[in-house]
């Protein structure tokens, strides 16, 4: 049984799909005006693992992750680069896909773009106007939050606490400071960049919040199981999505479970342009850090807890994966999925417990320690296959030993040096043994002496 922490109810709950034969999940995707940073990547990695777990437990899963390809940030980027929104969004969508593939993330079932769903957006706004939950003002259309009496259920914020300023737009055309825009009129830059559409309220473009409500409805219907995203989206974005969707469809629960991953900091500071500390996935990859190392670093902390990104996080991830890949040496890891090996039950149980990936990783470490102590080759092979298959379930050990270490040395020479070192140690000639270890290290080979007297590299 899968248990997940539901932000809406503020407690861990047994996950019970609306349709036991078909799980539906929507996750807020990127706004494509720049390359992805590690905060973006954390969210993608978390829901990628959840996607794999749900498929394992329930079979059919429809995972929708949108692309926000019309937004003020995209328009500003297009204007600054003397380009257009389609070129900017297409370029950065491609970059996003490349970066996410590099960290072993599977593609969602559907990846709708806001610009391709404007018709759905307009119809949803019309429905909100007709039902009295929205109003026109100075060529804008706003959602009236006072018309939705459950506003604040997700975030805990109440309508009378929403004052102008901070994250609430100051606008005299609103009935309430917390009212948010559903449709905005085109301005000069919109006309210049062709970032506008025809609508019953004139030429313009949609607000951000209505885009996700429309796309989730278009691909998953009025009600679905899981809505995910970063904790920074809880308010106002997700709160506003709930208000729109439940107001548009009477009796709808919209999303049954709300899942949020925690904040990401860099050296205990908020990641921001002003601090010049934004860490891009592409920059890490270009510096020679493997995508799988980035993935491990993002998975090491429980998804709901804050993750502080430091150099140690990366070095620890690299060291751990080196250790794991050494255990896989000799296995055909590329075809391990077709083997009869079973994924560890304890490993899966950890994931079922509110996606406790750190606990699952701890189980991998326990399996690794046990493998190193085993002398029965048949049992050792069986456990190693299970170890690799379990790791691959969360997107690790997707490569092979040879590719990971890019070994281009004479295997016989390495084994000869290891045998000479054993003889030196047996004869208590420790200086010679240490020199051989150093020689191997210079060749890029790290050796490990096991309790059973064997040496692995």
Curated annotation (Swiss-Prot):
Keywords from the UniProt entry: Aminoacyl-tRNA synthetase, ATP-binding, Cytoplasm, Ligase, Metal-binding, Nucleotide-binding, Protein biosynthesis, Zinc
Localisation per UniProt entry: Cytoplasm
Chain location of the short sequence motif 'KMSKS' region per the record: 270-274
Enzyme class name: ligase
Keyword hit for Ligase: yes
Keyword Cytoplasm: yes
Binding site for ATP: 273
GO terms of biological process kind: cysteinyl-tRNA aminoacylation
GO molecular function list: ATP binding; cysteine-tRNA ligase activity; zinc ion binding
Motif placement: 'HIGH' region: 30-40
Catalytic reaction(s) noted: tRNA(Cys) + L-cysteine + ATP = L-cysteinyl-tRNA(Cys) + AMP + diphosphate
GO cellular component entries: cytosol
Cofactor: Zn(2+)
Binding site for Zn(2+): 28, 212, 237, 241
Binding note for cofactor: Binds 1 zinc ion per subunit.
Signal peptide from the UniProt entry: none
InterPro entries, sorted: Cys-tRNA-ligase, Cys-tRNA-synt_Ia_DALR, Cys-tRNA/MSH_ligase, Rossmann-like_a/b/a_fold, tRNA-synt_1_cat_dom, tRNAsynth_Ia_anticodon-bd
Pfam families: DALR_2 (PF09190), tRNA-synt_1e (PF01406)
Annotated EC: 6.1.1.16
HAMAP family linked: Cys_tRNA_synth
Assigned protein family: Belongs to the class-I aminoacyl-tRNA synthetase family.
Oligomer and partners: Monomer.
Name of the protein in question: Cysteine--tRNA ligase
Gene: cysS
């Amino acid at each position: 049984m899968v248990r997940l922490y539901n932000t809406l109810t503020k407690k861990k709950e047994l996950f019970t799909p609306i349709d036991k034969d078909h799980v539906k999940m929507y996750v807020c995707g990127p706004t494509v005006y720049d390359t992805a940073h590690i905060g973006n990547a954390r969210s993608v990695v978390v829901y990628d693992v959840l996607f794999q777990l749900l498929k394992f437990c329930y079979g059919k899963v429809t995972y929708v992750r949108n692309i926000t390809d019309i937004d003020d940030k995209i328009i500003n980027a297009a204007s600054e680069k003397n380009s257009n929104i389609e070129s900017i969004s297409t370029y950065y969508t491609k970059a996003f896909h490349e970066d996410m593939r590099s960290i072993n993330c599977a593609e969602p079932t559907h990846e709708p773009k806001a610009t391709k769903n404007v018709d759905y957006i307009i119809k949803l706004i019309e429905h909100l106007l007709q039902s009295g939950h929205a109003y026109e003002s100075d060529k804008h259309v706003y959602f009236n939050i006072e018309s939705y009496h459950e506003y604040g259920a997700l975030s805990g914020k109440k309508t009378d606490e929403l004052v102008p300023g901070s994250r609430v737009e100051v606008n005299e055309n609103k009935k309430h400071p917390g009212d948010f825009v559903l449709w905005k009129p085109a301005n000069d830059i919109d006309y210049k960049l062709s970032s506008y559409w025809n609508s019953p309220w004139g030429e313009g473009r949609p607000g951000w919040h209505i885009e996700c409500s429309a796309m989730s409805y278009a691909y998953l219907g009025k009600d679905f199981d899981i809505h995910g995203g970063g904790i920074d989206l809880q308010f106002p974005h997700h709160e506003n999505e709930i208000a729109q969707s439940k107001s548009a469809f009477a009796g709808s629960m919209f999303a049954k479970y709300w899942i949020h991953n925690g904040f990401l900091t860099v050296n205990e500071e908020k990641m921001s342009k002003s601090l010049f500390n934004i860490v891009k996935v592409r920059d890490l990859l270009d510096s020679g850090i493997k995508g799988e190392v980035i993935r491990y670093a993002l998975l090491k902390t429980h998804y709901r807890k804050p993750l502080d990104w430091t150099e140690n996080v990366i070095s620890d991830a690299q060291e751990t994966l080196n250790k794991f890949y050494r255990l896989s040496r000799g296995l055909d890891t590329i075809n391990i999925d077709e083997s009869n090996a079973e994924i560890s039950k304890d490993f899966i149980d950890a994931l079922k417990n509110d996606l406790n990936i750190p606990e699952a990783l701890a189980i991998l470490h326990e399996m690794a320690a046990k493998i190193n102590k085993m002398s029965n080759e048949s049992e050792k092979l069986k456990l190693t296959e299970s170890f690799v298959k379990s790791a691959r379930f969360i997107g690790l050990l997707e490569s092979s030993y040879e590719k990971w270490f890019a070994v281009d040395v004479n295997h016989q020479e390495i084994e000869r040096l290891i045998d000479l070192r054993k003889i030196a140690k047996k004869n208590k000639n420790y200086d010679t043994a240490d020199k051989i270890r150093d020689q191997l290290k210079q060749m890029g080979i790290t050796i490990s002496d096991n309790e059973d007297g064997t040496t692995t590299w």
